[in-house]
């Protein structure tokens, strides 16, 4: 029990690192991501049809505590809000709305139970489903985790929406404490088998850290880093979605091969 308490503290601290800024987020030059991390072959056909026909784009961001920042205006600076801003810039003729549904301290299996009602309530073209951290902390069997994610993906698709999976966030402080690799592999498996995109937040944040774009150790003392990380995640996710939906070629995006 003490072991899980320590793990929970470590992951909670990692979430706080990236949820500490409450100042206005602005675009940053540190957002560079290799194109191979964002561009893939799995298409978002429902998104394409909805945007082309209705010029509206309804998204639900389903996730845990790392979806938003603390404080009364914290939701404004989390990556879902930054995603809405990014998509509005990329698709200026489209009305974009991102609703955030936060379900903290839930496993993927628990989150699946609420997907049907979520689809009825919001009628989205796209669900951005962030999961994995709580399962990793509590040692869910990776095969059971994979099965739960696959079930959730099928529910979303059967409900008439597309899905983008978002995996765990990277923190150098928890890297040696919580084993994430098996869960990252599960995301990749579901992506291949069910032909859905994965926004590899774990690899992207690790890349930024390794390249010195963000000092995620320093984030414990300099919480302003959090707003920049969320801004960059929103921009990168927006680029990935626009590409997967074949809506436009964002400026600076290399041509698809």
Language-model segments: which ranges?
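Cell-envelope and extracellular/periplasmic
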Residues: 29-34, 100-106, 128-137, 192
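Catalytic His-Asp segment of secreted/periplasmic serine-dependent ester chemistry enzymes
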Residues: 170-257
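Solvent-exposed loop/turn segments at secondary-structure junctions
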Residues: 65-68, 103-109, 132-138, 169-173, ...
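Bacterial N-terminal signal peptides that target proteins for export
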Residues: 1-12
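Bacterial N-terminal signal peptides
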Residues: 10-20
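Internal alpha/beta domain cores that form substrate/cofactor-binding pockets in large enzymes
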Residues: 58-61, 94-122, 134-165
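Serine-esterase "nucleophile elbow" of acetyl-processing enzymes
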Residues: 28-100, 115-123
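Active-site segments of SGNH/GDSL-like serine hydrolases
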Residues: 130-133, 152-184
């Amino acid at each position: 029990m003490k072991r899980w308490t320590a793990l929970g503290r470590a992951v909670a601290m990692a979430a706080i690192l990236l949820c500490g800024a409450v100042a206005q987020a602005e675009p940053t030059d540190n957002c560079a991501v290799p194109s191979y991390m964002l561009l893939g072959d799995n298409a978002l056909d429902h998104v394409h049809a909805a945007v082309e026909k209705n010029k509206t784009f309804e998204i639900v961001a389903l996730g845990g505590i790392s979806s938003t920042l603390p404080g009364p205006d914290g939701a404004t600076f989390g990556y879902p809000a930054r995603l809405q801003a990014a998509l509005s810039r990329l698709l200026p003729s489209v009305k974009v709305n991102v609703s955030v549904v936060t379900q903290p301290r839930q496993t993927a299996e628990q989150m699946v139970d609420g997907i049907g009602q979520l689809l009825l309530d919001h009628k989205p073209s796209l669900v951005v489903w962030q999961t994995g951290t709580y399962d990793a902390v509590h040692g869910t069997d990776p095969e059971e985790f994979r099965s739960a994610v696959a079930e959730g993906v099928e529910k979303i698709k059967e409900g008439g929406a597309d899905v983008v999976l978002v995996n765990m966030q990277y923190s150098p402080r928890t890297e040696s404490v919580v084993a994430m690799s098996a869960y990252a592999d599960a995301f990749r498996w579901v992506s291949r088998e069910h032909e859905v995109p994965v926004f590899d937040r774990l690899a992207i944040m690790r890349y930024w850290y390794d390249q010195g774009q963000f000092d995620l150790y320093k984030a414990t003392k300099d919480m302003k880093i959090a707003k920049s990380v969320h801004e960059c995640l929103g921009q990168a996710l927006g680029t990935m979605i626009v590409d997967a939906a074949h809506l436009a070629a964002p400026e600076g995006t290399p041509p698809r091969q």
